[in-house]
């Protein structure tokens, strides 16, 4: 049985990983760590695990020693050194943070305020969007799990950019997320009286997911792609919905666009292109690893509009990480992820 561990197990992403991994039939959780709750039983921190596990938060070195696959669920800047130890011990590292998502060191320094600590390691990391990089992921031992907003936006745009059908500049990405995307640490913006009955844009023009999205989209289009990205906080726990506006290079009808999307995603089980006339929504992807995409045209402005919806904690984080692990280990891609959203 493959042993799996988590470093940073008690944040929202880490604990969501645990919840999903406990239902995975091909792995066993060997050890977990948490700086904030070192030495404490998991079910004393999160009561939803009572009777399901006797895991105790231990130290990072024990997690590396005891497991074959290690997920690192840490704030930016903390994963590089740890990932180096994991790779040196011939283990698989799936990093949930931002440390390996950007390939350009200058860009990384601009957005995150530091240089790469281990430049050679960055060269061997693979961006873990399975619908784009499945074969590369299969051969890798270091995965940069994509961000939640980038996942929703990139899945929404890949087919158009691969087919060179839209202009690479002037793309507008208007995204809304549940508050779990801000993490478990206390914040005024996510304080209940501030967020309840409210709807707030934040980090306008300066969100750190911007360079990640632009780099991946530019690689797909083989030309520089620029976006205007504005995230918003919804007064809900989980889910992301992105409304993406782009301009076609030549006039194209909606049926042709729909066929391009259905052809591209036909063998990618976690992405569902909705029938024309339907509109993607958070409700129908919540608590699943699915992405729903709906396609629309603004005939008055000759503009393509894509709606892309995911669960930010699953397809946007923990579920996608498990999907990557399944690919690397040769399991069925949906192992542990055969999740259906509740109807209400």
From Swiss-Prot:
Coiled coil feature spans: none
Compartments, record wording: Cytoplasm
A Gene Ontology cellular-component term: cytoplasm
Gene3D superfamilies documented for this protein: Dihydrodipicolinate Reductase, domain 2, NAD(P)-binding Rossmann-like Domain
Stored SUPFAM superfamilies: Glyceraldehyde-3-phosphate dehydrogenase-like, C-terminal domain (SSF55347), NAD(P)-binding Rossmann-fold domains (SSF51735)
EC numbers, comma separated: 1.2.1.38
Keywords, in A-Z order: Amino-acid biosynthesis, Arginine biosynthesis, Cytoplasm, NADP, Oxidoreductase
Catalyzed reactions per annotation: N-acetyl-L-glutamate 5-semialdehyde + phosphate + NADP(+) = N-acetyl-L-glutamyl 5-phosphate + NADPH + H(+)
A Pfam family assignment: Semialdhyde_dhC_1
Superkingdom in the source lineage: Bacteria
Residue ranges crossing the lipid bilayer per the database entry: none
Molecular functions (GO terms): N-acetyl-gamma-glutamyl-phosphate reductase activity; NAD binding; NADP+ binding
Listed pathway(s): Amino-acid biosynthesis; L-arginine biosynthesis; N(2)-acetyl-L-ornithine from L-glutamate: step 3/4
Keyword Oxidoreductase: yes
GO biological process: L-arginine biosynthetic process
Catalytic residue positions: 148
Alphabetized HAMAP family for the sequence: ArgC_type1
NCBIfam families tied to this protein: argC
Function: Catalyzes the NADPH-dependent reduction of N-acetyl-5-glutamyl phosphate to yield N-acetyl-L-glutamate 5-semialdehyde.
Family, per entry: Belongs to the NAGSA dehydrogenase family. Type 1 subfamily.
Protein's name in the database: N-acetyl-gamma-glutamyl-phosphate reductase
Lineage, opening ranks: Bacteria, Bacillati, Bacillota, Clostridia, Eubacteriales
Encoding gene (name): argC
